[in-house]
């Protein structure tokens, strides 16, 4: 069918339609044979008929035809086919490349056999299987994204060191000495009274409890950092086969060490916030006010 439609176009390419000539106004009484350089297949019967006379010097057939075909949306297929016969060199590219055509306006395809041009074919064209598959994939992706758990917000400070010289440390002993770093920069502070190992999670839990109670705009200083890895082996394992894998990080704290400090609030608010932070720690502590 496609070859047949193209053969019809080739056969009628050199023929002239009276409808096209009727679009051109008569400008002078010159005979039609003067157009022989544009239309070499014109016959003598056409020159003696009642077609209006005009000269080729005052008319641009390409421009005239384009002005008459500015709006192609309302044309039917029969009219479009007739316009192809009138001036194929102009209308062929226009009809094939009209916006709204998915596969191109090729003669013999289902789009060209439709009763309207491609600008309106988009509204009534068939639903392809590919579009259905794409919709299914989008639904599956959306359902997967909904099931994903929400990511936890990162804390303002790092809980563990980013890089260490050695991956595993010796366990060591808990010293009973007194800390020499007991200075305070702010008004209120929390001081330890016994040696302990404070994990990174406990340090972060105490800091968050203080910041929530004192409100925004005020800072809480943390004087300790969990820099020692603690290894743990699974239960009921035999002797040997190396040291266990690092399980958590701790900060070694001696008596008299300052853990948190803050300022800019009243004593009542500071005491309440620090008491909540002290309940998160595994060691005995006391509330300090600097003079």
From Swiss-Prot:
Compartment(s): Mitochondrion
Transmembrane segments: none
GO term, biological process aspect, one: translation
GO molecular function (one): rRNA binding
Keywords: Mitochondrion, Ribonucleoprotein, Ribosomal protein, Transit peptide
Gene Ontology CC terms: mitochondrion; ribonucleoprotein complex; ribosome
Alphabetical list of PANTHER family matching this protein: 50S/60S RIBOSOMAL PROTEIN L16, LARGE RIBOSOMAL SUBUNIT PROTEIN UL16M
NCBIfam families: rplP_bact
Family, as annotated: Belongs to the universal ribosomal protein uL16 family.
Protein name: Putative ribosomal protein uL16-like, mitochondrial
Source organism (scientific name): Arabidopsis thaliana (Mouse-ear cress)
């Amino acid at each position: 069918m496609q070859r047949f439609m193209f053969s019809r176009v080739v056969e009628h390419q050199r023929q002239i339609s009276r409808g096209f000539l009727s679009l051109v106004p008569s400008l002078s009484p010159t005979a039609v044979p003067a157009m022989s350089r544009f239309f070499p297949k014109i016959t003598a019967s056409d020159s003696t008929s009642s077609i209006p006379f005009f000269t080729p010097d005052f008319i641009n057939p390409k421009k005239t035809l384009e002005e008459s075909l500015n709006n192609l949306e309302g044309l039917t297929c029969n009219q479009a086919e007739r316009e192809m016969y009138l001036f194929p060199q102009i209308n062929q590219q226009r009809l094939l490349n009209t916006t709204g055509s998915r596969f191109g306006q090729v003669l013999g395809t289902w789009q060209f056999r439709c009763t309207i041009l491609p600008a309106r074919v988009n509204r009534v064209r068939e639903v392809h299987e590919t579009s259905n598959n794409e919709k299914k994939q989008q639904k599956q992706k959306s359902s997967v994204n909904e099931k994903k758990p929400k990511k936890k917000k990162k804390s303002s400070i790092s809980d563990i060191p980013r890089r260490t010289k050695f991956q595993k440390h010796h366990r060591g002993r808990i010293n009973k000495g007194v800390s020499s770093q007991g200075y305070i920069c702010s008004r209120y502070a929390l001081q330890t009274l016994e040696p302990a190992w404070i994990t990174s999670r406990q340090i972060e839990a105490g800091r968050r409890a203080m910041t929530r109670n004192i409100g925004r705009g005020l800072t809480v200083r943390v004087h300790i950092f969990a820099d020692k890895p603690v290894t743990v082996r699974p239960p009921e394992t035999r002797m040997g086969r190396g040291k266990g894998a690092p399980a958590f990080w701790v900060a070694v704290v001696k008596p008299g060490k300052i853990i948190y400090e803050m300022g800019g609030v009243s004593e009542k608010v500071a005491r309440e916030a620090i008491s909540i932070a002290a309940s998160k720690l595994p060691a005995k502590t006391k509330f300090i006010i600097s003079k």
